[in-house]
Amino acid sequence: MKEFIAHIRESREVQSHQDHSRNVAKLCGEACKSIGVEHVGYLAGLLHDMGKAHEKVQNHLWNQTSEKLNHATAGMRWIWNENKQKKPSYKLMAQIVSMAIGCHHSGLDNFISPKGEEDWEKRLASETAQQLYEGSVKAFLEQCMSVEEATELMHKAVTEVITLVKGINTEEATLAFFALSMVQRFLFGALVDADWTDTKCYMNGEKLPEPVCDQQRQEVWNRLSESVEQYIAAFPQKYAIDAERTRISNLCLQVAEQNDRGIYRLYVPTGGGKTLAGLRFCMRMAQKQNAQHVFYFSPYKSITTQNS
């Protein structure tokens, strides 16, 4: 059996299906490590293009035909078929991975429609899904992943899902399901980003980005925090409002230095320097914790528009 491809450059150089699948698995797993589901992410990345392991899809890739072929459903269907008769933890893992795979080109769907119908299961059983399924699975398990590896990965992924569910500290079903939906969204986003990143790097002849280590991230926060401090220190102190803004900003910095992570509120009148005071707090907290991200949310409309 000839080696299947995932992408082809204008120069007719090709990226193998196996290389793309492994690269996406690595990137997706690395991203999902931060929420404790590294193997869930790796499994989703590895299976996401299972449907490309079919002669019809390969012909489309080589010849750039206009035929529309569904290559996303094969991996979605396989992971579900392998686990739907097992324990609830296996079924939950399979649902999460299945939905991320099936939607990685179309956008995340609902498990259940407003009418209470499970449209995703209808998709698994659709005629278009069936056409490519058997051939794709057989070829994929020969070229990209063995059954033994798949079994081991699924077991590790289930262990992560069990730990995740136990860590959702609430007895309220609505909140628990919301938490799981956030995991679903995270996995979906990680998979799409990993897929696009590997595709872009290959097509542009670039190396895949290396994961940022703790030391590198700490150096970034140190630089950013110092930049914010220098920027704020350069403000003139001409008027009483300048002194008050500085006082508020210093209090925010003090809170960041004396406290650990948590939820904090800042109540300051309009014009009191909330934006920069909050940024200063945020940078120092991120520096202390060597955080992975800082998210900044701003109003859709300006403050003056909201108050008018």
Predicted regions and their residues:
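Accessory nucleic-acid engagement/destabilization modules that flank
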Residues: 1-13, 17-230
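Conserved phosphate/pyrophosphate-binding and hydrolysis machinery centered on Walker-type P-loop NTPases
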Residues: 14-18, 40, 176-180, 238, ...
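Conserved pre-motif I regulatory segment
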Residues: 17-20, 27, 39, 45, ...
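Extended hydrophobic secondary-structure segments that form protein cores and membrane-embedded regions
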Residues: 44-45, 98-103, 265-271, 295-297
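Flexible loop/turn segments at secondary-structure boundaries
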Residues: 53, 108-109, 272-276, 303-305
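Glycine-rich phosphate-binding loop of nucleotide-binding enzymes
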Residues: 247-250, 254, 282, 286-298
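Walker A/P-loop
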Residues: 259-285
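Conserved Walker A/P-loop ATP-binding site and its immediately adjacent core
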Residues: 277, 291-308
